[in-house]
Regions:
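Bacterial N-terminal signal peptides
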Residues: 9-19
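Bacterial N-terminal signal peptides that target proteins for export
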Residues: 1-9
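N-terminal targeting/docking segments
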Residues: 2-3, 18-21, 126-131
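Positively charged, low-complexity intrinsically disordered regions
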Residues: 6-7, 23-25, 53, 125, ...
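Central antiparallel beta-sheet cores of small beta-barrel/beta-sandwich binding domains
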Residues: 24-100, 106-112, 116, 131-215, ...
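Intrinsically disordered, low-complexity Ser/Thr-rich linker and spacer segments
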Residues: 121-140, 236-239
Length: 239
């Protein structure tokens, strides 16, 4: 009887320890999150996708007004604390905490412009959703490489970097980055190259470039369109 009693006590202790350890392990923030940033008179609907890695960081994207799948920066996950930055016009830093049940992520959003601090709350609604890398038809060698341009908007000059490359499998890929808004590389969603004419779509920011490459292959001259906004944009090949 004593042996049986001792066995039960040991088993109870082990189970108790296991439960304690499990309770101390925070939930994984990986997943698709939906919610809003709360302003005094309105709520701005947003969606965030996170995929945690083993080093306290991870991969993430942001979707909101006129933005879908914009890459997040500075992702940091420490226990229940989760932080990330949206490096875009109107963006800012998110700092939040994961609820014990792993279903809610809430905290504060600090806007880049004005430094306003606003509450946000997100609810988990499934697995993280990331678009597969886009592969377009092969482009001419005159388009391959890195291109630099300057876009004028509301009296501000923004430096734009465009990268286009052919891949070994016969496809092409591209990215666009605003060097004055965090230099985040946004994937190009479509590249069309017919003779000298070039069309580049950037679905993430609902933007597109339509233009032509010169005979020397040193300039791309055209127009950038994003919603109702249009402006001339000329890229020069980087040496």
């Amino acid at each position: 009887m004593k042996t049986g009693h001792r066995t039960l006590l040991v088993a109870a202790a082990v189970l108790s320890t296991t439960s304690f350890l499990r309770a101390q392990s925070p939930a994984d923030p990986s997943g698709h999150w939906q919610g809003a940033i709360r302003m005094p008179n309105q709520a701005i609907a947003i969606e965030v996708d996170l995929d945690r890695n083993t080093t306290g960081g991870g991969k993430g994207t942001f979707s909101g007004v006129n933005i879908k799948g914009y890459p997040l920066s500075d992702i940091a996950i420490d226990g229940a604390a989760v932080a990330f930055t949206l490096k875009v016009d109107g963006g800012g830093a998110f700092s939040g905490k994961l609820a014990a049940d792993g279903k809610v992520l809430s905290g504060e959003f600090t806007a880049n412009s004005g430094g306003y601090v606003l509450p946000f709350e997100l609810s988990r609604s499934g697995e993280a959703k990331f678009d597969a890398p886009v592969k377009n038809p092969r482009i001419g060698k005159e388009l391959e490489g890195t291109w630099s341009g300057a876009l004028e908007a509301n009296g501000t000059t923004m430096r734009i970097l465009l990268k286009l490359a052919n891949q070994p499998d016969g496809t092409s890929t591209g990215s666009l980055a605003n060097l004055d808004q965090g230099a985040v590389e946004i994937p190009v969603s479509a590249i069309t190259h017919t003779a000298a004419n070039v069309n580049i779509d950037v679905k993430v920011v609902s933007g597109s470039f339509s233009g032509a490459v010169n005979a020397a292959g040193t300039e791309l001259t055209g127009t950038w369109s994003q919603g109702a906004f249009t402006a001339p944009l000329t890229f020069h090949r980087d040496k």
